[in-house]
UniProtKB/Swiss-Prot annotation:
This is Large ribosomal subunit protein uL10. InterPro entries: Ribosomal_uL10 (IPR001790), Ribosomal_uL10-like_sf (IPR043141), Ribosomal_uL10_bac (IPR022973), Ribosomal_uL10_bac_type (IPR047865), Ribosomal_uL10_CS_bac (IPR002363). PROSITE patterns: RIBOSOMAL_L10. GO terms for cellular component: large ribosomal subunit. It comes from Cronobacter sakazakii (strain ATCC BAA-894). The lineage of its organism: Bacteria, Pseudomonadati, Pseudomonadota, Gammaproteobacteria, Enterobacterales. HAMAP family: Ribosomal_uL10. It comes from the Bacteria.
């Protein structure tokens, strides 16, 4: 279906607006994946706070101009599915990584985070980022361990001082 100029402008405006508010982006090639599987992916994306869209490469190049995802321009070759993580930087990467494991024909092309291009081979860097809750839990456990260790050392020093006296 041919798009008229107004439709193209609307697509560019929508994708550009989403890109400005996104934390990260992942680009993939979904050739050979069934419609049912893509529907499952889109549903999982909505639940994870990921905006997904298949967009023409020329329109996508225009949409990412002036955003942190401009570094992805070289990845816009062939059929392009772009996903923006809106709530957590690793959400789209994690979603695509899991989907690619189950679907051999689904290929992740590249990702971008804070203006840095992440090649498909290093997508784990983005996919393994802890969520906000996980990061807080790790920080709290580290602080708790440090406090407990300090208490143990203090008690040992008091015990040694009493033994010496």
């Amino acid at each position: 279906m041919a798009l008229n100029l107004q439709d193209k402008q609307a697509i560019v405006a929508e994708v550009s607006e989403v890109a400005k508010g996104a934390l990260s982006a992942v680009v993939a090639d979904s050739r050979g994946v069934t419609v049912d599987k893509m529907t499952e992916l889109r549903k999982a994306g909505r639940e994870a706070g990921v905006y997904m869209r298949v967009v023409r490469n020329t329109l996508l190049r225009r949409a990412v101009e002036g955003t942190a995802f401009e570094c992805l321009k070289d990845a816009f070759v062939g059929p392009t599915l772009i996903a923006y993580s809106m709530e957590h930087p690793g959400a789209a990467a994690r979603l695509f990584k899991e989907f690619a494991k189950a679907n051999a024909k689904f290929e992740v092309k590249a990702a971008a985070f804070e203006g840095e291009l992440i090649p498909a081979s290093q997508i784990d860097r983005l996919a393994t980022l802890p969520t906000y809750e996980e990061a807080i839990a790790r920080l709290m456990s580290t602080m708790k361990e440090a406090a407990a260790g300090k208490l143990v050392r203090t008690l040992a020093a008091v015990r040694d001082a009493k033994e010496a006296a």
